[in-house]
């Protein structure tokens, strides 16, 4: 009997929270699944994982490794890094 009471109480509290934060949940889902949302940024045509500019699985994954080799060079200044980023962006 205690388990059933605890379960019903948990469901009631969960229902209360869900109805009070409906707009918040909708905003979170819109942020994740929307046109410019997080998932589109990761998996879309210009996403980070599989897109053209994707550093992990994109068409230019090997050239991005070259960029990482330069990025960890301690002798580069911030201006050098900006110029290098622009070169690799246009490459």
Curated annotation (Swiss-Prot):
Question: In terms of one coarse class, where is the protein primarily found?
Answer: secreted
Report keywords, A-Z: Amidation, Antimicrobial, Antiviral protein, Membrane, Secreted, Signal, Target cell membrane, Target membrane
Q: Where is the signal peptide?
A: 1-23
Chain positions with Leucine amide modification: 33
Q: Identify the tissues in which this protein is expressed.
A: Expressed by the venom gland.
Excised during maturation, the propeptide residues are: 37-91
Q: Name one GO cellular component term.
A: other organism cell membrane
| Lineage top rank: taxon | Eukaryota
Q: Does this UniProt record's set of keywords contain Protein biosynthesis?
A: no
What is an annotated GO biological process for this record, any one?
regulation of defense response to virus
Q: Where in the cell is it found?
A: Secreted; Target cell membrane
Question: What else does UniProt say about it?
Answer: Shows a low ability to inhibit hepatitis C virus (HCV) infection in Huh7.5.1 cells.
As for family, the record states: Belongs to the non-disulfide-bridged peptide (NDBP) superfamily. Short antimicrobial peptide (group 4) family.
Q: What does this protein do?
A: Antimicrobial peptide.
- Know the name of this protein? Peptide Ctry2146
Species whose genome carries this gene: Chaerilus tryznai
The top of its lineage is: Eukaryota, Metazoa, Ecdysozoa, Arthropoda, Chelicerata
